Curated annotation (Swiss-Prot):
The gene coding this protein: alr-1
PROSITE patterns associated with the record: HOMEOBOX_1, HOMEOBOX_2
A Pfam short name: Homeodomain
Bias type Low complexity, positions: 322-343
Annotated region of DNA binding: 117-176
Key words, A-Z: DNA-binding, Homeobox, Nucleus, Transcription, Transcription regulation
Taxonomic lineage: Eukaryota, Metazoa, Ecdysozoa, Nematoda, Chromadorea
GO cellular component, one term: nucleus
Natural source organism: Caenorhabditis elegans
Protein name: Homeobox ARX homolog alr-1
Span list, region Disordered: 1-34, 92-118, 174-193, 313-362
Gene3D superfamilies: Homeodomain-like
Purpose of the protein: Transcription factor. Involved in activating or repressing transcription of genes in neurons. Regulates expression of nuclear hormone receptor odr-7 and LIM homeodomain protein lin-11 in AWA and ASG chemosensory neurons. In concert with lin-11 and forkhead domain protein unc-130 plays a role in specifying AWA and ASG cell fates. Plays a role in modulating dendritic morphology and functions of AWA neurons. Involved in regulating GABAergic motor neuron development, acting in parallel with nuclear hormone receptor unc-55.
């Protein structure tokens, strides 16, 4: 029994340490009532002890809870916004980087004490850019050996050279796309051929007019030859004309060695039609001039000249069909006329006999 008393005393001490009143079971009491009374005692002990009380939480959607959350968010934003001291510290860090940092990066300690590698912009000199551009003009994708050789020549690392070539290729592709696929392309500029020599147009026009004058002079000379031959035939009707003058076409087309000069002469607008109009006008003028010259010649002489021209055209057609390589059809026809007909020799003798008395009388 005394041992039991000791145990009860130890229990009482524990209850005192827990700041709880001792629990006693009444003798002969019901278990249900005992459990109810025990729960009531425990609840009374919990509410009586302030250390064991639970904190009171406001409802989730109450006005006070919402206002408290907004105040907390504003305080967090105020902590995140940089102050003047933080800006000054960042500026000093940037100055230190610019003054004491090499071009290709250094290892700077992080906040946690770790070494972190940082890269900085490389400033290239004019000599380095010149050498890099020369190699880029030769090849856009240099191999490792070329990059190493170039790096040693321009005093850079091979990694810097490789990065420069990557950026340069990207810039080249961007320029190529902008120049080829631009929605508003500039109109193609017409090259000015007179930029180097301002007198080129004047010289070309002078050449054109000289060619026209040359053709007109040749035409007039041929007309004079025909008139002279017709006069001689009128004096001696039995002697055929054996001159080998070329047959003139009905329309004279001047030849131009430089087509660009002709285009410049007519302003560059539809040069073909302008040239045709000019040729037609020129041929009409020459035809009118020919008719005026032939109008002053007697009718018999013009008929004989037309007969000779018809004979020449027939001889030329026959020679072209036979495929003969005679120099000119007029010369062959003239030679045949003088060699075959016996009357020609008699006419020549009569002409010579007529000329000798005239020379003796003179």
């Amino acid at each position: 029994m005394p041992e039991l008393k000791k145990e009860d005393s130890s229990k009482d001490e524990k209850d005192l340490d827990m700041n709880c009143p001792p629990l006693h079971r009444p003798n002969g009491a019901d278990l249900n009532q005992y459990s109810k009374s025990l729960m009531e005692q425990l609840q009374a002990q919990l509410f009586a002890n302030p250390a064991l009380q639970f904190p009171s939480f406001p409802p989730a959607f109450s006005i006070a809870a919402l206002t408290n959350n907004q105040h907390e968010l504003k305080e967090d934003d105020g902590k995140k916004t940089p102050t003047g001291d933080n800006i000054l510290e960042a500026a000093s860090v940037l100055d230190n980087r610019e003054n004491g940092s090499p071009s290709d990066g250094t290892n700077s300690p992080d906040d946690n004490g770790k070494r972190k590698q940082r890269r900085y912009r490389t400033t290239f000199s004019a000599f380095q850019l010149d050498e890099l551009e020369k190699v880029f003009a030769r090849t856009h994708y240099p191999d490792v050996f070329t990059r190493e050789e170039l790096a040693t020549r321009v005093q850079l690392t091979e990694a810097r050279v490789q990065v420069w070539f990557q950026n340069r290729r990207a810039k080249y592709r961007k320029q190529e796309r902008s120049s080829t696929h631009h929605p508003y392309q500039a109109p193609m500029s017409i090259p000015n051929s007179n930029g180097d020599n301002p007198y080129q147009m004047m010289l070309s026009q002078e050449a054109i007019f000289a060619a026209i004058n040359q053709q007109a002079a040749a035409h007039l000379l041929n007309e004079q030859v025909r008139i002279a031959t017709s006069d001689r035939r009128s004096q001696s009707p039995s002697v055929p004309v054996t001159t080998s003058s070329p047959i003139l076409p009905t329309s004279v087309t001047p030849t131009f060695q430089n087509a660009d000069a002709l285009n410049m002469l007519f302003g560059g607008i539809t040069p073909v039609t302008q040239q045709l109009l000019y040729v037609q006008q020129f041929s009409r003028a020459m035809d009118a001039f020919r008719t005026q010259l032939l109008g002053s010649v007697p009718a018999g002489a013009t008929a004989e000249v037309t007969d000779v021209v018809a004979l020449k055209t027939e001889d030329s057609k026959s020679n072209s069909r036979a495929g003969s390589s005679s120099p000119t059809p007029t010369e062959s026809s003239g030679a045949a006329a003088t060699s075959t007909s016996p009357t020609n020799f008699a006419d020549m003798n009569s002409l010579i006999s007529d000329v000798k008395p005239k020379e003796e009388s003179s």
